[in-house]
Amino acid sequence: MSRPAYSEPEPFADIHIHFNWDQKEVTSASEVVARLRAHNAVLVQVSSTPPRLALELADAAGPWVLPYFSPYLTERHRTTWAVDDNVVAEAAKGLASGRYKGIGELHVFPDNGLRRENKVFNGLLQLAARYQVPFLIHTEASSHLFFAPVCQKYSQVRFLWAHAGNRLQPDAIDQLMQQCPNLWTEVSARDPWRYGKLTDSDNLLLPGWRELFIKYQDRFMTGTDPVWGNSEDNRYANADEAWDHYTQLIEWHRNWLKQLPPEVEEKIRLTNARKFISGN
């Protein structure tokens, strides 16, 4: 009996992955590349802590993996980057080398007292403008109004908004995208195991999302954001086995994407990322 022909999945632009120190402990760069290739991820953006690991993954893969410069120079910098002037200097060196293709992911939490006027934050934004590279930003705010003044002040910067504001609903996302034409939005980590609020228990898009994706079909992208167990208090005390869950994450994205009109699905799955990276 002949076996059914293998059908390769559609090419996928995974615009939000990580290869961090606590992931490298259990998954090598070559293993990450193999998993990406197995799922036909043809264009990938990676940020790493420390930043050099993004270069390591890009070297293992080739030009289809684009390394971003992470402001987290060590595993401790996620909570201290905003008070370390060396972050801007190191980012400037990284971008001047030509090897890093963007800045981020940068977590901006107003609840932690970070003000929009913060010197390090603005220094990084100025670098993005100077080198004309994208800025991957993760905001943790109850309203889109926190981020609006930033993307308006730096109108020359191409922002990629991680997780569509995490828990914000389509109406708030719509308002921000109207206010900031330089803002692109991605919905990584909106899966049921982390932020959620994109699909219901049957994996169907929740009200408002389909309409939002169609309205801004040229400015949405997606990615898997393979980080696992990050809601646990002791998250950084253990190795991160997220890459063992990559199939689960990417298949979930492929499923909800199929609920969109074919031309919109292809844009969000692939072609928007290509245009975003090229600056078009």
Question: Could you tell me what each predicted segment is?
Answer:
Residues 55-59, 80, 91-92, 114-118, ...:
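Distinct, well-ordered alpha-helical segments
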Residues 7, 51-136, 189-192, 198-199:
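Active-site gating/metal-coordination segments in enzymes
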Residues 20-22, 51-54, 74-76, 109-112, ...:
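Active-site environment of divalent metal-dependent phosphoester hydrolases
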Residues 99, 123, 130-134, 153-158, ...:
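Glycine-enriched alpha-helix->loop->beta-strand junction motifs that scaffold or abut catalytic
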Residues 1-63:
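An N-terminally biased module of ancient metal coordination in phosphate/nucleic-acid-related enzymes
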Residues 158, 166-280:
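H/E-rich (His + Asp/Glu) clusters that bind or coordinate divalent metals
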Residues 13-17, 44-46, 65-71, 102-105, ...:
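Hydrophobic faces of well-ordered beta-strands that scaffold small-molecule active sites
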Residues 17-28, 75-82, 111, 194-198, ...:
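Acidic/histidine-rich helix-loop elements
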